[in-house]
Amino acid sequence: MKKVVLLILDGFGINTKTPEENAIVQANTPTFDKIFPLLQTQLDASGRSVWLPDGQMWNSEVWHMTIGTWRINKQSLVEIEDMLDDGSFAKLEWYKWAIEHCQKNDSSLHLLQLFWPGWVHAMDSHLEKILKLIPSDIKVFLHLFWDGRDLAPNSLLPLMQSFEKKLHEFPNVQIASLAGRYFAMDRDNNRERIQKAYDEIIFSQFQTSDTPSEYIAKSYEKWIMDEFIEPISFVGYDQICSWDSIIFLNFRSDRARQMTQALMVSMHPELKFEYPKRSRHFITKQITNMY
């Protein structure tokens, strides 16, 4: 019986197209120089080969899962992207229920999401495609959270400026509130942080007449960067009303869990959040339980 060794070298890749950019190629590696000619194949650990967007490496979780299961695992962001592109997203039972519920009760739809061009917790392109699916007779309120950790800490102002222009195509859509992820996506039971973002989503406690871009720019002037932007709501938004539907669009659950529990507080009395005594229909879906 032949013995097999699985040797994992972190950061050790094969790049022959631009060897001047590959430290391994430039280094003196006599042992690997002997081993490489004996290799029978190469593995691609990025892009669609591991069910990620083309050209993306993402993070080590993908590789851990692929190595551990020895198969390609569908990654949430790509599966959602494919479903939005082929039309199957609009056929999901929970999505159809949320839309029909709003139409039946003449109520609003609230979408919550980390808004950024990355792919760890959510993707802004998903939000834009979902907005195109929603019937124009439904009022849509967006509750957007800023990153500031996986991107530069002040990178989202131009993204918001661009998004505000795109929203002219959707007269039924309004940005209702903003919050840095420090508040809205805490996962360490700092409930006072979640409370501040929750109060804006539920009660619209502190309103500003600024546009979202203006509010972000003023925050930057105070050296308050994306992650720590204070929760705020905007003129034109009141609060979550009876029979509204809520969909949390983050596909990674760890930093969506506490806000979800807060919004579902009537089902979790141990959580010390105030909440309006009214019916709220809340939907939070990860790709793993969309079916």
Regions found by a protein language model. Give the residues of each.
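Active-site nucleophile/metal-coordination loop of metallo-enzymes that catalyze phosphate/sulfate
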Residues: K2-V5, F12-Y182, E192, K196, ...
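Short, hydrophobic/glycine-enriched beta-strand segments
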Residues: K3-D10, I246-N250
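Short, exposed beta-strand "edge-strand" segments with a Pro/Gly-rich flavor and a Y/T-containing core
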Residues: I24-Q26, D86-A90, F203-D210, I246
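Long, well-ordered, tryptophan-enriched scaffold segments
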Residues: L151, P158-C241, F251-A256, M264-P276, ...
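Active-site lining segments that contact anionic ligands and/or coordinate catalytic metals
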Residues: W243-I246, I287
